Structure formats: C-alpha cells, structure tokens
C-alpha cells in the first residue's frame, strides 16, 4: 500500500501538530504578551500545518492524489484539529477561551497555504 518512507514523511506534521497543541493548551498567565495579533499567529501556524500535511500526501506518493482530494483531506484535518482545540479551550482550560475568529484565522491559513502549494506545484517548484 504505502511505503515506510511515506509514513516517515509525516513526522514533521506530527511534530508541528504537537507544537500547536502545546501552544493552545498551556496557560497564558506568566507568559509575556506578544505585540503580534494572535489571529496572525493562528493563520501562520495552521498554514505551516497545511503545508506539512500537503507535502507527503500530494508529492511523496507514487500514486499522487488529485488536488481536490488532497485539499479535502488537509482542510478537514486542519479544520477538525482547530475546532476541537477551540472547543476544549472553551470548555476545559482555565484562562483560555475558544473563539470563532481563531477558527476563521486557522481556516484562512489552511486555504491560503493550499492555494500557494498548488501554484508552486504547477510551476514545478515543488
């Protein structure tokens, strides 16, 4: 089915997912505030996540999935991850609040990254 190297190509994605989870669930008390908008951070973190998930699915397989299927997989995975994190923040984590605008920033980061990946693939850069 898939080669061992295919599964190893997901290691950066899993590590980045862990970074997102840790950053989303740690308490913000005692951490100095950043001058950058948190929505920009959400956008960038999920854009990076989308690229790291896109690459092994679309590029590193012999039978590359279609662009649409790859986008659906990446989008739904990222959207599900972001939704669950926002829900857990809202219901469980003290001092953290789930926000719809965070989820919107996550989604825009995913969509933007997918569009850039496909443009670069068509120009044979990726």
Where are these regions (language model features)?
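Bulky hydrophobic segments
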Residues: 1-103, 107-126
């Amino acid at each position: 089915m898939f080669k061992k190297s295919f599964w190893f190509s997901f290691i950066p994605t899993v590590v980045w997912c862990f970074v997102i989870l840790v950053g989303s669930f740690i308490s913000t008390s005692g951490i100095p505030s950043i001058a950058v908008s948190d929505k920009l951070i959400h956008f960038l973190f999920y854009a990076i996540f989308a690229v790291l998930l896109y690459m092994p699915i679309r590029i590193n397989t012999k039978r590359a999935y279609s662009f649409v299927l790859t986008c659906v997989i990446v989008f739904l995975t990222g959207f599900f991850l972001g939704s669950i994190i926002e829900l857990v923040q809202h219901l469980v984590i003290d001092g953290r609040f789930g926000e719809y605008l965070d989820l919107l920033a996550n989604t825009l980061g995913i969509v933007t990254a997918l569009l850039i990946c496909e443009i670069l693939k068509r120009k044979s850069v990726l």
